[in-house]
Amino acid sequence: MIAGTEKGKSMVNILMLSKWHVHAKDYASMVKAQPDAKITCVWDEDAARGQAWAQELGAAFEPDLDKALARADVDAVVVDTPTADHKRVILKAAKAKKHIFTEKVLATTMADCLEIAQAINENGVKFCISFPRLTWPLAQLCRKAIDEGSLGRVHYMRMRVAHDGALRGWLPDYWYDKDLAGGGAMMDLGCHPMYIASYLLGKPMRISSVFNNTCAPGGVDDNAVSVVEFENKAIAVLETGFVGSIGGEMFELLGTQGAIIQVGKYLKMRTSKFEGGWYIPDKLPEQQAPALR
């Protein structure tokens, strides 16, 4: 998204909007790794944190968001603010004609998401949200198998993405503040199964969910599941949690003539084109470039 944002421009200048998110440092590293992108400025809702980060990155710090967005040496922004603040900062960035890369999730309500989309379209800026697993080999393998028809009619998907952040206490305390984060495990980790399901199965039609809290501070959900029915009648069971010390990564995609199953790093499949039953693919699709590129 960043490289080549401005046609003919040799260097794209980036404004980092907050270090709140746990992946903010990773995104800064990705920007710095690009030969044609540079972090020129940092803004943060926590001025002390932002000032320290700007010094670490060798960039300017601007405590006023409007002034930061008005800088001539800013072409695009990377949004890592609290989720609850996404709408405000993204709308300002769009109106300032800055291209936008944002951490997921986009916003905390559908109305806010639609307002953001409208502002992006009206202001003609480029936009990308971080859905990293779309670039992973598993997603590309499944997409190819569906497109080729080698699984038959796909009718079921199950995906689990979980970790033990609440169970073992390694997430920052503010991660459990619903007023900042917008929710708990499903809002954070659960979005990965959600967008993969949409990528593979199409448009969702109805959803039923169960969220509960076992140990996470603040009462946010740390153990959750959603069952989604799609327009093509496929059903997806999408699981997540902050208490998943074992079995954090599981995936199943089932069709009338084949299936793809992955547990951890172990993957096997069977298709209508292979008569020998289950097999392990010799080669998976290549990992695609990250969205920030």
Give, region by region, the residue ranges found by the protein language model.
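N-terminal Rossmann-like dinucleotide-binding module
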Residues: I2-E56
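Hydrophobic residues in well-ordered beta-strands that form the structural core
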Residues: M16, P63, F101-T102, F127-I129, ...
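Predominantly a Rossmann-like dinucleotide-binding segment in NAD(P)-dependent oxidoreductases
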Residues: V22, L134-P217
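Beta-loop-alpha module in the N-terminal Rossmann-like domain of NAD(P)-dependent dehydrogenases
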Residues: D46, L57-A119
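Rossmann-fold dehydrogenase core element
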Residues: E115-R133, R153-Y156
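C-terminal glycine/acidic-rich active-site capping loop/insertion
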Residues: P132, E252-R293
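Contiguous beta-strand/loop segments that form the cofactor/metal-binding neighborhood of enzyme cores
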Residues: Y195-K268
